[in-house]
Amino acid sequence: MTHKGISLIVIFLIAGLAVAYFFCLPKELFAGTEYSTVVTDRNGELLGARIAKDGQWRFPECDTIPPKFQTSIIEFEDKWFALHCGVNPVSIARAAIGNVKAGHVTSGGSTITMQVVRMLRGKERTLWQKMIEAVLATRLEMRYSKEKILALYASHAPFGGNVVGIEAAAWRYYGKPAEELSWGETATLAVLPNSPADIYPGRNRKSLLNKRNRLLHKMFKDGCIDSTDLELALEEPLPAAPEALPQEACHLVEYYRKTNPGKRSRTSIDIHLQRQIQAITDQWNEEFSRIGIYDIAAVVVDVHTGEVLSYVGNANPRRKRPGADVDIARSPRSTGSILKPFLYCAMLQEGELLPNTLLPDIPMNLGGFSPQNFNRQFDGAVPASEALARSLNVPAVYMLKKFGTQRFLEVLRRCGMTSLGKSADHYGLSLILGGGECTLLDVTKAYSRISLSYQAADTTFNDRKSPLHNFPLKDKCALWYTLDALKEVNRPDEIDWRLISSVKRVAWKTGTSYGFRDAWAVGVTPEYAVGVWVGNAEGQGAPGLVGARTAGPVMFDIFNMLPSKELNDKYAADGWFLEPVYGDYIKAEVCPLSGHLAGPGCESSDLLMLPRKAMKSEPCPYHKIVDGMKTFILPPSMEWYYRQNHPEYAPYSPENSENYAIMEFIYPEGGSTIYIPRQLDGSIAGITFNLAHRLPSAKIFWHLDNEYVGQTQFIHQLSLTPAPGRHTVTVVDDKGNSLSVGFTIAVNEKGGR
């Protein structure tokens, strides 16, 4: 072979070796390594962690390491770390001489960089492997800075048992972050990777103590610590058995284990607030458990940032009980009445309702659905704001029927209710009473956006990064009346907060689901939104499970401990919302009795600010000019119940009924289909017809399909058993006034609907 050929071969060999050397390290170091799921609060404090899939406590890689550990590990493992290029010939020579003198291997001479390579490769500790590690170490030094190599070492070094990395070791052995370790604690951990199996804390304590103390004396000799540091460090005890990691917001930690496993997640949680609120819910959990109510969830949201500051998925998670592991804050639950403010605000915004519009509160049957108020009573007519504050069900159903279930469902979805995935037909009118299921997290965030929307500038709604992007409730006037109505809700302790300056003002709403299975309380101020759910995770009801009596007190306890913020702008000050002086609204004359726009028959009027669309609403339909006098006349069905609660109401007694209805069917509704169950003996159950007459003393004569069936006086109710099919009931009073209603009877063979 010629000299030129040999030269080419050498060149190719050198080039090949250079290429091999350049690519000898994997592109991503420690790829495929399983890490623990780590969750921290907004300031980086550990909320909790979950062990890696391989059973190791190995936190995700850190970018930097504490200065004390950096000093300690360099002093103990590789004093010349800052000077060498991955391999220290002096250390290798010293180790070789020492091993020969001892007659066995006493030191390996590996640098920190070589140890990182060994951790990466996981090969046996042989001479050949050490040579490979030396080559790879030089390449590692070319790729990364000294700080990065130290961070890799600190993240992957073994610290005994199933503990890997300085962060996990600091928490497992000392129950604190690595940055807070003392010199004695840091030195203890620094000597562990050298022989983790032999000096695992709790096993060979004497050997561990000797190694730690030698390192401390060495650092003192080299000027790393002073005499005081040395004296204090030598007096520190060794760690005992491994400690449990923090368990703050454990349901939130579990959520991140499922959604972001093996990663480090920094949340918006304030750990100090979290601990306080956890203590509140734990205390109430002890109280409620005595009456068969075992679970509580609570969420606190910062109104202006939309951040979740505290997240209690379930109280007392360490207390072993069925359902303790269920994250209620993210579990869809029946909403009860908690969604009513969104309907009230939406209708105000669209001009389909005025703040105090009188709404019917009378028995209704809407396609077989007959809503009932919580107290089983009827007011006849009630202002819309009062109906919201008192959480009356019948007016709410009337409002939803008028607004439309599909429209309201779209509003709720745009407000952030992510669990309402079924059609409007599926929910029906019961949507406003708990026929749908939402999560506490979604509901609390939606309430916070009501507060934020009122305080936000109009341009905020166009910002895609804003929590208000796509939020449908924007009208300042509608939002103000909604918040104002909600602050009138009675508190659980029956105290009038307006008389006590130290009690925080809160706009809040409760909800209780059918069967007393879910109790809600969600409140909002200009600063915070707080949501609380109380019940049993497994779904069983309890007699005392009512929102105002259970979730309400918990919510107010949380509000009372939240820190106040400085608020002083055009929408909020001194902890409460200011009446709007800016915005697209109008001033209009409103009837104080009916809540409608004042009409020509109204005796007086109030000048109110209203959303601009309110001008399309109808004028007062109840004030009439009769014989030259302005008279307030309710429909008979509303009047019957209204005058029982309003003795000042003077019922209208016309001489004839040419212009005003003198009687009205309360039940059934004209054209309705009535589903009645078949009894056990095969017969069909009867129904009770209900009529309101302006003159209760009047005699009413009842006819079913033109056949006389009876008469009533004072209380105009009559039970009949019509056959399946279409029918007409006609009533005639003793003055000759008549009224008819048509309906259809259908038999429900399954026993009801």
Residue spans for each PLM region:
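Glycine-rich, acidic and aromatic/proline-enriched surface loops and short helix-turn segments
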Residues: 115-122, 155-162, 179, 183-195, ...
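Conserved catalytic neighborhood of penicillin-recognizing serine enzymes
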Residues: 101-125, 179, 242-258, 353-408, ...
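Surface-exposed patches in mature extracellular/periplasmic domains of secreted proteins
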Residues: 81-90, 128, 150, 225-231, ...
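Residue-level preference for non-acidic, small/hydrophobic
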Residues: 44, 73, 116, 149, ...
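Juxtamembrane regions of bacterial inner-membrane/periplasmic proteins
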Residues: 2-290, 303, 307-309, 314, ...
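Soluble, non-transmembrane domains of envelope/secretory-pathway proteins that act on or interact
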Residues: 3, 14, 506-753
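A penicillin-recognizing enzyme superfamily signal
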Residues: 267-288, 300-302, 311, 319-329, ...
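Short pre-catalytic segments that frame enzyme active sites
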Residues: 45-58, 168, 197-201, 254-261, ...
